[in-house]
Amino acid sequence: MTKPAFPSSTFRVLLSILLLVSVFLPACRKSPAPVFDAAAHKQEIEKWQSNRLAGLKKEDGWLSLIGLFWLDEGENKFGSDPSNKVTLPKEQAPTLAGTFKLDHGHVRLNARPGVAITTGGQPVSQMDLKDDNDDSGPTILNLGTLIINVVKRAERIGIRVKDTASRTRREFKGLDYFPIDPKWRIEARLEPYQPPKMIPIENVLNMTDDETSPGALAFEVNGKTYRIDPILEKGETDYFVMIADETTGRETYGAGRYLYVSPPDASGKVIIDFNKAYSPPCAFTAFATCPLPPQQNHLPFRIEAGEKKYAGVVH
């Protein structure tokens, strides 16, 4: 009888190894990279543009902002008389509607009898007001078509006034965009700051606040690596990014543009889609307090994506 080439025990071991390889080898193969769906991306950006427009045009959107008044310590009169500290449209307010009392950073409303101010649909004549830095948001006051709340910027306290019937809102000219371009949907990586870095951010009123940056976003354009610092705002998960580029002050708004990006995935990857870059509120109103891009976020190339500067008149 011819002897087997291998002892039976050896043959069984080899067979077991082959079976294991056949099971686990496919699992070890790298999955193919997902195919980019340009049509789906276009739909995503168009939906984002639609939501952007709706948010801008809503009753309490930035188009309705008509006034910003910084308070002095003590009593601050408000009403339609031009001598008041807070001047309201005469169609919506009496000559003297009441006072806002500023007391070491705290504001109290004192309305005159018969002035129909409400908050949350309920009449109010006296109350302490929360500002827009409060965790639950500011106290919103309504007087006719006016929407009034307290804002805090650096060490200053002010009264912001919106009007649902504002001229800017009525005469809004719409938004204009660069063509949607998937090349400006860029993969970046987060280079974390340990600990997170405090970055001084100046606004259009020359006020400066320190904001928290979780790390630099590093990405490539035309073979070169660039880094920008996002901001992680209080209570938010998405990163807020302020940028300027070589279109700034030309095709796009002169103070830069903003966008939000989702936080990094488990590998540290972040998608920056410049097709979602938009103009700050001060592109539409003279009464916003827009923060400005820090110097490290000034990019030395043209980003021909996202929102162009507003063609209408700012009142």
Report the location of each language-model feature.
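Bacterial N-terminal signal peptides that target proteins for export
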Residues: 2-15
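Bacterial signal peptide processing site
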Residues: 29-31
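Surface-exposed beta-loop interaction hotspot
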Residues: 142-209
